[in-house]
């Protein structure tokens, strides 16, 4: 639009596209933003909310799709193994419990770099991989940064996508170098019990 006129909004763009195609109603997810819904309604479009999942075809996977997901997850396994080996081979500086690799402190950035290299060699991208230590590990989706320490939880969460197929994998593991504190051991036991309960409930057709 010209500078003296109001800039086009997302609702304007959607309305124009629908008008050009003689579309008068749209099926939208039940969680569709109410503000945008009202704007589209004002522009003459009827919205029909649909139950989740919105894309029903995503409920099932073909054999080839399942195989591709398994392949990407196998690559993810390799990346997690590389992170594990780096932590395993690190040394503990007993004065302050800092982890070292050679003469350098082991950092979240170095672990993430190691993970990324494995993924890139397999044509996968690991965006926003999490390597979070200590208090940072308690903040969901905190990427983590800086030096890693012994005796503290180290969360590693890798969720790469294949650059060719677009399929994702996801894996999270909690590591602790050296002796784990009792509080962390108790937390592990609780999570392990919950995990076992979840596995027993998993079967085809369960919502």
Predicted regions and their residues:
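Active-site neighborhoods and metal-handling regions in enzymes and metal-associated proteins
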Residues: 1-207
